[in-house]
């Protein structure tokens, strides 16, 4: 693709975004993500011993990738290992998803129940065996009730502030 033909003010034509997660045991991670969250396996690539070294999963219309890497991968990058990340999964019924995850994990590992947030979402978070956090998010209202001193700022509001215009 010749990027020189794109102007600097042209919007990129994105077709998607997928997290790429690293696990020390990708085979176990793949099994856990499909069993606990109900993600659908799209494809996996196994090495000669049958261990997963890369896989693609689906969560609704979204995709995520995972890979198995050992300590030598992190040593070559000059870091001690993965630090995990937070992944947000948008759902239509967060309470039903919480029930599913809780049932799959059992009583000893069940996540905290969903909580309403001041920005109109109802969420719960659970960590996977690789140290990644997964927040399941249902937008329940457009009403935002921020704590005192907080404010919601959108790009158009920032532009108006910079030019002295009153947003309307």
Segments from the language model and where they lie:
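Vicinal oxygen chelate
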Residues: 2-20, 30-31, 37-90, 98-127, ...
């Amino acid at each position: 693709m010749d990027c020189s033909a794109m102007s600097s003010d042209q919007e990129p034509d994105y077709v998607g975004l997928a997290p790429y997660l690293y696990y020390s045991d990708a085979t176990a991670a793949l099994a856990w993500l499909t069993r606990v969250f109900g993600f659908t396996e799209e494809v996996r690539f196994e090495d000669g011993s049958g261990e997963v070294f890369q896989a693609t999963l689906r969560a609704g219309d979204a995709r995520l990738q995972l890979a198995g890497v050992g300590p030598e991968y992190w040593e070559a990058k000059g870091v001690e290992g993965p630090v995990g990340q937070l992944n947000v999964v948008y759902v239509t019924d967060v309470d039903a998803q919480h029930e599913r995850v809780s049932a799959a994990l059992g009583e000893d590992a069940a996540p905290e129940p969903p909580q309403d947030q001041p920005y109109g979402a109802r969420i719960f978070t659970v960590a996977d065996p690789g140290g990644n956090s997964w927040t399941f998010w249902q937008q329940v209202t457009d009403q935002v009730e921020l704590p005192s001193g907080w404010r919601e700022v959108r790009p158009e509001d920032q532009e108006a502030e910079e030019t002295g215009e009153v947003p309307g």
